């Protein structure tokens, strides 16, 4: 047993220090980023925010809506190949280039991914997604996927330390997904005692990835636009959002009415709700590691994503970053014990 004494930080532990700026308006901030990925050699241009591959967030409807903002969606893995065929038929490259095909690591998952990717050349992103990215099986699976799809952009995770980021990149991942337990409907840290404060995880993993020419996704832990900015400031190339994009018309799932008010169900992908729906219940050898909540129905996602991106633009003006890619270079975090004044409630 050993104890690491260095304090690790989450988003609530810091604020940006403001800096002099020559920007006159938020409209001058460029949020579009261009990436060339290490292994595939693919180029992508867009706003590097991703809707999470949860079946109450990462829907086909979400992908279509967010693509209008240049934002990506990791489509959840529970759509059938036939569902995908219909989606491909109905949408052009502007939507498909911003849609990630999510997969697990079983042989059936591999075959399904092959069938989906064969539908069109416009699908360029594959998201290999398991809860515990420290499995040797994940590394082997990434190698297998890279061998099968040498020209596709592969994301893999989830991990929270630089050593595994490096191993996954060397195995063939272009992007590594970072985050264990920070999500709003994730209870992994409570059920297992395992995790890593998300901001420190992003800072450390970004350093490891960028040293090898790889990229990272900061996955989870954001509850407001300021947290999204902090993730980018910490070095995340992409930021993945679940709860912030849940509860919308495009999120998938049914609208529930209680006492005259409308709600939508939102649940973690290791929750009992998810396992009841997709796996026939919680297996005897495991525990559910997610919660199920009812969120007030929020209407169209367009207003929410515009608000999030507006907040990120505002962050950039406060620290003097004319482009999103400059934000991490302009970032100085100060450690704090308070974030906001809650006299009249929390924002």
From Swiss-Prot:
Cellular component annotations (GO), alphabetically ordered:
cytosol; GMP reductase complex
Its name, as the record gives it, is GMP reductase
Query: Any idea which positions bind K(+)?
Result: 181, 183
Organism expressing this protein natively: Aliivibrio salmonicida (strain LFI1238) (Vibrio salmonicida (strain LFI1238))
Q: Which Gene3D superfamilies match?
A: Aldolase class I
* GO MF terms held by the record: GMP reductase activity; metal ion binding
Q: Where is the active site?
A: 186
Keyword NADP on entry: yes
> Under which main EC class is this enzyme filed?
oxidoreductase
What does this protein's UniProt record list under function? Catalyzes the irreversible NADPH-dependent deamination of GMP to IMP. It functions in the conversion of nucleobase, nucleoside and nucleotide derivatives of G to A nucleotides, and in maintaining the intracellular balance of A and G nucleotides.
The record lists NADP(+) as bound by 108-131, 216-239
The Gene Ontology biological process annotation of the record reads: purine nucleotide metabolic process
Extract the PROSITE patterns matched here: IMP_DH_GMP_RED
Sequence similarity: Belongs to the IMPDH/GMPR family. GuaC type 1 subfamily.
HAMAP family, alphabetized: GMP_reduct_type1
Pfam families linked to this entry:
IMPDH (PF00478)
Q: Which UniProt keywords apply?
A: Metal-binding, NADP, Oxidoreductase, Potassium
Q: How does it assemble?
A: Homotetramer.
Record EC number: 1.7.1.7
Substrates-to-products reaction catalysed = IMP + NH4(+) + NADP(+) = GMP + NADPH + 2 H(+)
């Amino acid at each position: 047993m050993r104890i690491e004494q260095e304090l690790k930080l989450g988003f609530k532990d810091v604020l940006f220090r403001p800096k002099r700026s020559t920007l006159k308006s938020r409209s001058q901030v460029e949020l579009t980023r261009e990436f060339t990925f290490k292994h595939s050699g693919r180029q992508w241009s867009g706003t590097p925010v991703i809707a999470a591959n949860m079946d109450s967030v990462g829907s086909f409807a979400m992908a279509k809506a967010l693509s209008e903002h240049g934002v990506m969606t990791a489509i959840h893995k529970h759509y059938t190949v036939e569902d995908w065929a219909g989606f491909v038929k109905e949408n052009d490259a502007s939507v498909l280039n911003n849609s990630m095909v999510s997969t697990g690591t079983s042989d059936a998952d591999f075959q399904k991914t092959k069938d989906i990717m064969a539908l069109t050349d416009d699908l360029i992103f594959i998201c290999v997604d398991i809860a515990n990215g420290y499995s040797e099986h994940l590394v082997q699976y990434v190698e297998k996927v890279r061998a099968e799809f040498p020209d596709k952009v592969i994301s893999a995770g989830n991990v929270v330390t630089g050593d595994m980021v490096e191993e996954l990149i060397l195995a063939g991942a272009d992007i590594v997904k970072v985050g264990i337990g920070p999500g709003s409907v994730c209870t992994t840290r409570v059920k297992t005692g395992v995790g890593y404060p998300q901001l420190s995880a992003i800072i450390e993993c970004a350093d490891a990835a960028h040293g090898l020419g790889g990229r990272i996704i900061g996955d989870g832990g954001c509850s407001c636009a300021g947290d999204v900015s902090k993730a980018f400031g910490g070095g995340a190339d992409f930021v993945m959002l679940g709860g912030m994009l849940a509860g919308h018309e495009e999120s998938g799932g049914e609208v529930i009415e209680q006492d005259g008010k409308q709600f939508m169900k939102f649940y973690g992908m290791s929750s009992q709700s998810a396992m009841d729906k997709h796996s026939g219940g919680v297996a005897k050898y495991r525990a559910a590691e997610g919660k199920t909540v009812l969120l007030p129905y929020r209407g169209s996602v367009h207003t929410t994503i515009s608000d999030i991106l507006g907040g990120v633009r505002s962050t950039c003006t406060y620290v003097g970053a004319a482009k999103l890619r400059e934000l991490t270079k302009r970032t100085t975090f100060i450690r704090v014990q308070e974030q906001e004044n809650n006299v009249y409630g929390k924002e």
